[in-house]
Amino acid sequence: SNSPFSENSLNGFSSYRSEVWKDTDPDRTGILTFIFDDGMSYEQYVDYAMKVPMYFIYRNGEYINLTGYTFDDFINGKIEEVKDFYPTIDDWELHLTTIFPEARLKKFIEMRGADAGNINHVCAHYRLFG
C-alpha cells in the first residue's frame, strides 16, 4: 500500500499511501517541502506545527474542541473559549500527535511510509535507515 503497486500491477502513483493521505487532511499530511531547504531546522518544523489547525485540548477530564484554531492562536491567547487556560507542554505534545506528514518528528524521526508493508519490506526499510 505504500508503493507504486496494487494487486501486482502498477497503480500510477509513486506511493499509493501518500496519495490517499494527500486527500485526507492537507493541513496535517503530505510531504513537507521545506525539509529539503538548505538550513532546514527543528525551528522550521515547530513553525509549521504552530500553524497546523488544532483538534482539541484536554482539561479536567473533558475534551475542549479547538477545531479551526492553531496552536499559535492558543499560545497567544486568541481563543476566547479557552482564555482561562494556559498552554502546557502536554497540550503541545498532544497537538504534535495530530500531525501526520510523511516524516514526523517525535523523539525520533518516524518514517510514515513504512507502516503499511509486509514484514519483509518493513524490516528492509529499517535496515536501510537503521
What residues fall within each predicted segment?
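C-terminal accessory/tail domains of diverse enzymes
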Residues: 1-130
